[in-house]
A protein has these predicted regions:
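Amphipathic alpha-helical hairpins
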Residues: 1-165
Length: 165
């Protein structure tokens, strides 16, 4: 990695990490989660968010274009750690209902990671005067916040249903 000596370089570095996160989610993580999930409402929510995530990738790629940079993803140990933890635990969960609850929690953790990253990048983009980029990142942020609301609602419903059995 080259030395980072100015805010713009730091911003591009953060974008590379976020591109990795969104690509990994769209290509691998969300489709796998959708296959795992039994609850139809939750499954549909993940399917919809997969499509949103593909748009997030396009928005980040557009951001690179606006900056005159090549969109190169940079590995995110944060998302890889969440995925590894999920894989470690999920194989030990015997009940489909409990697995859905666990998957909802895993999805919420990922949304929090994405929300924090987008908020940080928006602050930097605003400081750099990159208004068009701010708009693209805010679009992604708004969808991540909405996805978090949905997954929290699903998690609450799943816990209530499982506890009532």
């Amino acid at each position: 990695m080259a030395a980072i000596t100015e805010p713009r370089q730091l911003f591009v570095n953060e974008l590379k990490g976020m591109l990795y996160v969104e690509q990994r989610l769209a290509q691998d993580v969300l489709p796998q989660l959708e296959r795992e999930i039994q609850n139809n409402e939750f499954k549909q929510s993940i399917r919809e968010h997969t499509q949103e995530t593909k748009r997030h990738v396009a928005n980040i790629e557009r951001t690179f274009e606006l900056l005159g940079e090549e969109p190169k993803p940079d590995k995110s140990h944060a998302v890889d750690g969440l995925v590894a933890q999920h894989e470690k635990v999920v194989k030990n969960i015997q009940s489909p209902e409990l697995r859905d609850i666990f998957d909802a929690g895993a999805a919420a953790k990922t949304e929090h990671l994405e929300i924090a990253a987008y908020e940080s990048m928006i602050t930097t983009a605003e400081s750099l005067g990159e208004n068009e980029i701010v708009s693209l990142l805010e679009e992604n942020l708004d969808e991540e916040k909405e996805a978090l609301k949905k997954v929290k609602k699903v998690a609450e419903q799943l816990v209530r249903e499982t506890a009532a059995v």
